[in-house]
Structures are given as C-alpha cells and as structure tokens.
Amino acid sequence: MKKAIIVIIVAIIALIIILNSKNILKLIYKTNYSEYVEKYAQENDIDPLLIYAIIKAESNFNELAESNRGACGLMQLMDSTAREVATNTAIEYETGNTLYNPEKNIALGVKYFADLKSQLKYT
C-alpha cells in the first residue's frame, strides 16, 4: 500500500512537470529579452525555447559577450554572417556596435538559424 502511494505521488509530480515544462524552462532561462525572442521566433516559426537555449549556450545572456574569434552579442554572430543575413532581409545592419544591440542581435540570429533550418529542410 505504501509503495502504491509513492508511485502515485511520483506519477502526479511527473505529470505536473510534463504539463508545465514550458513554464519550468522559462524559470530556468533568464527571460530579459523575451519580447525580442518571442517576436522573432514567432516570425520565423522557431520554438522560442530553442532560441533561449542558443543564447544561454553562446553568451549566457550577456549582451556584451565577445568570443576570441570576434563573434558578438547574445547569439554570438560574426560581422560577416550578420551582414549577409541583413542583405537578404529588411533588418537594418551597420558594422560596429549593432551586434551588441539585443534586438538586432536576436533578429539577425533567429533569421540566420531559420535560414539554416530551411537549407537543411528540417521541420
């Protein structure tokens, strides 16, 4: 009887976690840039949680992050990549501090990711 109660409690907890997984993940990831992530993820049909994960891995949510190779900002974009993405879209880009602008960085980074996804025909 005691074992059955424990199994039921564990099952209920697991069900709660599964049903609230997006909310739990949003608690784990900082969502300081949620306005931009949600907007550009939706525009490009990308799961916003994937974008949060990329930002976490690339810059740990530090908008001033810079790699030793020159990748900049939240999504760690190279100037050449950002320029290429911007020329194929309506996103304005100027070489310099643009990659440190969270909205521009996320807009360009999400679009770049969406383009890669499309090239690989991954849905």
Residue ranges and their predicted role:
Residues 49-52, 72, 107, 111:
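Active-site phosphate/pyrophosphate-handling residues
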Residues 15-64, 68:
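Export/targeting segments at the very N-terminus of extracytoplasmic proteins
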Residues 4-20:
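Hydrophobic membrane-insertion alpha-helices, especially the h-region
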Residues 69-75, 80-82:
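Early exported N-terminus immediately downstream of N-terminal targeting peptides
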Residues 61-64, 71, 84-86, 109:
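Membrane-proximal soluble helical/coiled-coil segments
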Residues 35-38, 42, 79-123:
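Alpha-helical segment that forms one wall of the substrate-binding/catalytic cleft
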Residues 60, 73-76, 98:
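Residue-level preference for alpha-helix termini and adjacent loops
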